[in-house]
Design a protein with these regions (language model features):
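Short amphipathic alpha-helix adjacent to the substrate-entry channel of hydrolases
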Residues: 1-9
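Conserved small/polar residues in nucleotide/adenosyl-binding loops
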Residues: 224-229
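Short glycine-enriched nucleophile-adjacent loop
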Residues: 58-69, 75
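Catalytic histidine-centered segment of alpha/beta-hydrolase-like enzymes
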Residues: 214-223
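Active-site loop/oxyanion-hole signature of alpha/beta-hydrolase fold enzymes
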Residues: 12-52, 56
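Conserved alpha/beta-hydrolase catalytic His-Asp/Glu region
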Residues: 86-89, 112-175
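Flexible "cap/lid" loop of the alpha/beta hydrolase fold
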Residues: 66, 76-106
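Conserved loop-alpha-helix segment in the C-terminal half of the alpha/beta-hydrolase fold
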Residues: 178, 182-214
């Protein structure tokens, strides 16, 4: 972030249920995050920002812009998933998974297994970094601490994700975008080119770029370089 802060005013937020934010017991929906993003921009930033998203959070920005056409100046999405992955809706099976994860004992146990230190390390090394040795003990501790803050209440967000409550179709919103949408994908990720092309085919103004030797973790230095060019 220090590289970006030299050239831009940067706001970074932990969304509700994530990181060091509060993790209340509720159903986390896509619309909840759309509204949180909209309110943050109106109440804190006070002007149209360039928004940078990672992974699934592209849906919050795209849908927020769709609901408020003058909200954003541009969207840069880093390693977004395929658009059709957002088309899922809660069904009987996913609702059962959500209910199980919210149970006091069983749900907490399943969450603690998922967020065990060894599983966090494995995920970071295999998915978020192209070179496993870049995963430091300090980084691992930060992820572990954040996932277990609030007596493992992060399980409520995980339950909503597994229940597909955080999903919402974005194809129509991408098609209607009139602001710049930049898609940045890691070349090492499966189907990266196909995913980026799917956004470009939906809206001809979408611009795509690729970063080599990177996993899912955002690369601020590379992003700054791409912005400059």
């Amino acid at each position: 972030m220090k590289k970006l802060e030299k050239h831009y005013t940067v706001y970074t937020i932990d969304l509700l249920g994530c990181g060091r934010s509060d993790k209340p017991y509720l159903t986390y929906t896509n619309y909840l995050y759309v509204q949180l993003l909209t309110d943050f921009i109106h109440d804190v930033i006070g002007e149209r920002p360039d928004v940078v998203t990672t992974g699934n959070s592209i849906s919050f920005a795209v849908l927020a812009q769709n609901m408020n056409p003058n909200l954003l100046a541009s969207i840069t999405a880093i390693n977004p998933p395929a658009m059709n992955s957002f088309d899922r809706t809660p069904d009987k099976y996913s609702s059962v998974k959500k209910a199980l994860l919210e149970l006091p004992i069983l749900g907490t146990f399943l969450y603690n297994v998922r967020t065990h230190e060894s599983n966090i390390r494995r995920t970071l090394q295999k998915t978020y970094f192209s070179r496993p040795q870049l995963v430091s003990s300090k980084m691992l501790d930060a992820y572990y601490e954040a996932s277990h803050m609030g007596k493992s209440h992060g399980k409520y967000l995980m339950a909503s994700i597994e229940g597909h409550y955080t999903d919402n179709a974005i194809g129509h919103a991408v098609k209607k975008l009139t602001i710049p949408l930049y898609i940045i994908e890691s070349r090492s990720m499966t189907d990266a080119v196909a995913i980026a092309d799917s956004y470009a085919h939906k809206n001809a103004t979408v611009e795509t770029a690729y970063i080599s030797n990177a996993g899912l973790t955002p690369q601020p230095v590379s992003y700054t370089h791409l912005r400059a060019h």
